Amino acid sequence: MLQNTGKLAGCTIFITGASRGIGKAIALKAAQDGANVVIAAKTADPHPKLPGTIYTAAAEIEAAGGKALPCIVDVRDEKQINDAVEQAVEKFGGIDILVNNASAINLTGTLQTPMKKADLMLGINLRGTYLTSKLCIPHLLKSKNPHILNLSPPLNLNPIWFKNHTAYTIAKYGMSMCVLGMAEEFRGSIAVNALWPKTAIQTAAMDMLGGSEVGKQCRKVEIMADAAYAIFKQPTSFTGQFVIDEDILKKEGIKDFDVYAVEPGHPLLPDFFLDGQPEDLVKHMEAHGATPAFTTAKADPVAAGPVSEMFNTIRGIISPEMVKTTQGVYKFNLAGEHAGVWYLDLKNDAGSAGNGEPPVKADVVMSMDSEDFVKMFGGKLKPTMAFMSGKLTIKGDMGLAIKLEKMMAMMKSKL
């Protein structure tokens, strides 16, 4: 691994999304030099499924030798960012490095992506990066060797990286375009670069996309922390670069990359937006025991009807609370004009819903006409009446079927 040199001693680093994952790893690497770290993230209270808060991260940073300032920040909120910037300047005297790490991901096609999810990704990835940079730049300009580092991919305009998740790609490439523009705008004053991993990195987001078995195909977050550290050592003339973690570490003399592997010797999963094919990523994940929570298949015509619209709405209102209280996976075999198979997973991770077979075995299988399905989820047909009249057949856990009926009543006001 890359050794610390003390280069960042006394520097102030403002990191968004630093309560866990890659953001926290970068913070801890800098802390070993004695850096000041502003932890700008949303998680103030413990999350039921995700590790860490801004306060636990602060404690780890202090223990590693740095100084920490935990700030509750949603990067979509200009006031919260501005307050955090002001607190950082007041406590540490300025800002030397900004890391735009906060990000949201949803790998669904255009018809399957509710605007709520699209707005979330654009708001956090693109707008959040632009806004945080804008508010930090006046202070960065006063630093001796200022850097902005966006955790975003090279601008690979091959359509294969758009076709299955256009909204996510636009949002993520927006971060990369901030690099392209700001690097030129502030050339000679601030180094503005992007960093992206060559392979998948084990994070909560990766576990969500590939399931628990995907971890062994990943590298640890420390490789990204070391790569970021290598970038921060560069002068401001090193700017406008789209850096791949492994490439810059090779230039730093690192030869043994097995130390970064979650399971040394296991085949590694290439990351998105590089030279591979999306279909190959899915095959790689499946071949080594992971369960991809996304698809590379072309959009199905069935995804353009009223059933699809209903599922778009359902996706937009799935919440951790629903998953926690329901704990069931539902499969819907629909006949009629909009025939097809759909699923609703209110058991695993953050919950999911979509066209096709469920990612895991269904606890309940419901069969009915597509028109009746739309009526039922739209509140115009009671599930009990549909079942009693023979319009709905149910196989599996009846208790979970009843839970779904209760949930539909709660959903009715939101549909």
From Swiss-Prot:
The active site is at residue 168. The keyword NADP applies. It is found in: Peroxisome; Mitochondrion. Residues 304-412 form the SCP2 domain. NADP(+) binds at residues 17-23, 42, 74, 172. CDD domains: HSDL2_SDR_c. The keyword Metal-binding does not apply. GO terms for cellular component: mitochondrion; peroxisome. Gene3D superfamilies: NAD(P)-binding Rossmann-like Domain (3.40.50.720), SCP2 sterol-binding domain (3.30.1050.10). It is an enzyme of class 1 (oxidoreductase). Its EC number is 1.-.-.-. InterPro entries: HSDL2, NAD(P)-bd_dom_sf, SCP2_sterol-bd_dom, SCP2_sterol-bd_dom_sf, SDR_fam. GO terms for molecular function: oxidoreductase activity. It comes from the Eukaryota. Keywords: Mitochondrion, NADP, Oxidoreductase, Peroxisome. Has apparently no steroid dehydrogenase activity. Might act as a metabolic regulator that affects systemic adaptation to nutritional cues. Belongs to the short-chain dehydrogenases/reductases (SDR) family. This is Hydroxysteroid dehydrogenase-like protein 2. It comes from Danio rerio.
